[in-house]
Amino acid sequence: MRLEDYRSYYNVVLPIYHKIIIPQTRGEGWRIMEQLANDFRYNPLTWFVGNAVKTKDYYTHDEVIIYGEPGSGKTSYVIQSMLHVFEDVKEVRRRVIFDVEDLKRLLEDIRDGQRYEVVLFDDPSAVGLSSTWNMRSSAEKRRMLELFDAFVYVKDFISLVIFTVPRLIGVAKFFRDIATWRVQVKKDGKVIFTRREVASTRLGTLKEVDTPVMFYYIKDVRMPNEIWNEMMDKRKRITAEKIARFDSGDV
């Protein structure tokens, strides 16, 4: 993000954030934010992605979990944010993981010396990076565990990892614990960024809390047709494979 973009961002958005945080003016703040809907110059996630893409002489790694009800626009929001930075649908698609084959390709690329600035895991349960291990057979669980173990190491070669899930519990605890940001996308378009911070209780003990810090608003966000069609084809194929396994008794 350029210096002039920073100035514009803070001059326009910070006063709105202030209105949202203070209960007496919260409604007014969201009404103003709605007027900036889909203006990705004021989108915090665009800034995260853009910062990960910047050339650095040191390694960085961060994780963002984006959660919300099915149909709230989580995946479309992330992909449009990435597209605003990369400006190329193919470059965005290469960084999106929909299934095990995508994850395998990612691991092979990293093995061959490539470094990824940003990677989006859409529904981590599809590649075994979720907490729903009880839903898998023993053989499948062992296979997924191998990929999981590999990912724990190769994440150091990815600057920014983004997960999209319906509920926070859908991400394995390992990733929930190290994710700096948790982003809730609501069906009414509100996007709330919370940061994990350490706070002291009255008894003097320390605990982690999620503090709302930044906000955004989306309205009818759509992902590019090429990515949407491929995503739906993959989901249909996986569904067909599951039905075939069930019919054959191999479950």
List PLM regions with ranges.
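Phosphate-binding and hydrolysis-coupling loops of NTP-dependent motor/remodeling domains
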Residues: D188-V251
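N-terminal pre-Walker A segment at the start of P-loop NTPase domains
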Residues: E4-T55
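Hydrophobic/aromatic beta-strand patches that form the interior of the parallel beta-sheet core
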Residues: V64, I162, T180-V183
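A short beta-strand-to-loop transition that corresponds to the Sensor-1 phosphate-sensing loop
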Residues: F163-L168, K187
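A short helix-turn-beta junction within AAA+ P-loop NTPase domains corresponding to the substrate/partner-engaging
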Residues: K173-I192
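Conserved nucleotide-sensing/catalytic segment adjacent to the nucleotide-binding pocket
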Residues: R95-F163
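Short, glycine/acidic-rich hinge or "gate" loops at secondary-structure transitions
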Residues: R93-V96, R167-R176
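Glycine-rich phosphate-binding P-loop
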Residues: Y59-E87
